[in-house]
């Protein structure tokens, strides 16, 4: 069984653990650098990206997670997507810069503007998982404003990319872990 880490300093890491189990993987809740040696891939969960950055620095994990991402698969959702982006606006903030995208934080509005939407994935996603719409939970979600060459869009919502991949990296601006559909997590497992 594949072991996948979920950064567990803040955010919805428990929901990702359950989604990984549904997809057939063993979650490892990463709180210490030594745990990075036990896993094949890492999920950066949703939560609050500035708080996660502070905790990564406080726990002295920022450089270790950045190093992990240089050679291993990483999947970021919502705040995790922000942490993976090369560029961050509204306001600008530090990130790992793993994926050639620029994101705008909280672009869908305030907490009260959060929503659940049906998203039709592109054939490239469906051909590698299963057909059908994705239930996308957007909670103060970022918008991907710019993508560079080499980034593949797997699903969009209202014309904006919401699920992308670049090589071993997967990014969702929504929360696939908050639904019973394990296809996005299964796609990440295929990268391990």
Swiss-Prot record:
GO terms for molecular function: glutaminase activity; pyridoxal 5'-phosphate synthase (glutamine hydrolysing) activity. One of its GO terms (cellular component) is glutaminase complex. Pathway: Cofactor biosynthesis; pyridoxal 5'-phosphate biosynthesis. Coiled coil: none annotated. L-glutamine binds at residues 47-49, 105, 139-140. It holds the Pfam family SNO. Its EC number is 4.3.3.6, 3.5.1.2. This is Pyridoxal 5'-phosphate synthase subunit PdxT.
